[in-house]
Amino acid sequence: MNLLIQTLTAIAACTVLATRASAQSTVVPINNEPAPKLIVEPPLPGPLAGGVVFIQYRVENLRILPVGGPAARNVSPRVGHLHLTVDDLPWAWADYGQSDTIILVGMPRGQHKVLIEVVDAEGNVFTKQTVTFHSPGKEIQP
């Protein structure tokens, strides 16, 4: 059992070190940074069945921080945030959180879509993805 624990600990440590080795430095400015990448998972089925939407995501090559304006364009590694639009509504909201999960509650019953945009500090879009799902939520009466 002791050997198993040591082996698992070594594997976990190597995984963490390998992940950090490819991470961007926050000390030295990076020239020619790779483009930001957005990885989005489908909503978690368990909470969705209960009417709560959990959309997990990951952003690479960009730090999500609550900063804005033209001066932020010169920050390295690159900074930005998310713009989220639900069901093509004419408005969106900015997400500066670092939870890596979008949570929506109270969605009415039916098919929905969420547009997730990775933007720079001035709102210019780097990349985007749309997630579609069916909510079993309450039926809305007109």
Task: Locate each region found by the language model.
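Short, compositionally biased P/S/T/A/G/V-rich stretches that sit at domain boundaries
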Residues: S25-V53, I140-P142
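Short beta-strand segments within Ig-like beta-sandwich modules, predominantly Fibronectin type-III
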Residues: A92-Q98
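Short beta-strand edge segments in extracellular beta-sheet folds
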Residues: T132-K138
